[in-house]
């Protein structure tokens, strides 16, 4: 793995948070960058779910879950899989409609968004390649 330390923790596809083992923490330069407690994904998921339950309206729960999504995709999808019937209306419809309506007020992180312009269709492929981190051919 090329990424280490904060760079690794900043990658939501690689970040496991407190689920990194002691060996992984040492090898990946994470010693001291995470709380010392080592947890399983099951323990993390239980904690995240309990924290989400304490949130108020659906939009607050969605914002919280999207924050988890932005930090740790493994954990997000693990929790989502465990509670799919309950979380689907929060992450998707109908709460996403409210989220879209309030987009300007709650814009926090573009979640690696690719911005496409209807006025420049010739840029679509270049934009999508850039967003995916793929070099042009």
Range-by-range predicted roles:
Residues 1-137:
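Metallocofactor- and cofactor-centric catalytic cores in central/energy metabolism, strongly enriched
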